[in-house]
Swiss-Prot record:
Ranges in coiled-coil conformation: none
Family that this chain belongs to: Belongs to the Maf family. YhdE subfamily.
EC number(s) from the headed UniProt entry: 3.6.1.9
Record keywords, A-Z: Cytoplasm, Hydrolase, Nucleotide metabolism
Active site: 71
UniProt enzyme class: hydrolase
Gene Ontology cellular-component annotations: cytoplasm
Protein name: dTTP/UTP pyrophosphatase
InterPro entries, per the entry: ITPase-like_fam (IPR029001), Maf-like (IPR003697)
Cofactor: a divalent metal cation
Annotated site residues (Important for substrate specificity) in this chain: 14, 72, 156
Length: 205
């Protein structure tokens, strides 16, 4: 159970779904920021900065709460891929990823402003795509699934059949490395696993 109020500073339904797996109570208050990368940033630096800035923005409004911010990018051949803004961008991203391995970086930050507590971590996963035929790319782009996901695909959705192999955290590719988040919460003293969880199912209905 959580020992303090937790706020997820993200509008991502995937991140909320992953946190729900823990059976903990949390509030979603998205932070709306410019996610443009800086010229001098590496991908890990980019996601680390944005996750921290997202958490900091909401923590300033709720200094007593523990705020979780996160950011994810896909990187292939040194190029960062964010979220496609239109069908053309989605198609270009999938063509670029087809038959190749790419890296997914997710940065997450936990901030409790009143007590001056802050933790930030970046997690890396490698994903290998199959060769994707043109008709499959066209079908997937028309599904509308690509448009709010880094790299233009959803590992937990229809995009899963593009994937040959994942090395590293699956939940990291979804947008939140759950194992690392849990360990950080435990290390901060904000999450304990004492108590009976047999009523968890009824509490989630």
């Amino acid at each position: 159970m959580l020992t303090e109020k937790l706020i997820l500073a993200s509008a991502s339904p995937r991140r909320a779904e992953l946190l729900q797996l823990l059976g903990v109570d949390f509030e979603v208050i998205p932070s709306h920021m410019d996610e443009t990368s800086r010229n001098d940033e590496t991908p890990p630096e980019h996601v680390q900065r944005l996750s921290s800035e997202k958490a900091e923005m909401i923590a300033a409004l709720f200094p007593d709460a523990l705020v979780l911010g996160a950011d994810t990018v896909v990187v292939i051949a040194g190029r960062m891929l964010g979220k496609p803004g239109n069908p053309g961008e989605a198609r270009d991203m999938l063509k670029r990823l087809s038959g190749r391995e790419h890296i997914v970086y997710t940065g997450f930050s936990l901030i409790q402003k009143k007590k001056g507590r802050r933790r930030t971590q970046v997690v890396r996963s490698a994903v290998l795509f199959k060769e994707i035929p043109e008709d499959e790319i066209s079908w997937y782009v028309s599904s509308e699934e690509p448009y709010d996901k880094a790299g233009g695909y959803a590992v937990q959705g229809m995009g899963a059949f593009f994937i040959r192999e994942i090395r590293g955290s699956y939940t990291n590719v979804m947008g939140l490395p759950l194992s690392e988040v849990v360990e950080t919460l435990k290390d901060m003293g904000s999450l304990t696993f004492s108590g009976d969880q047999h009523d968890r199912g009824s509490n989630q209905e």
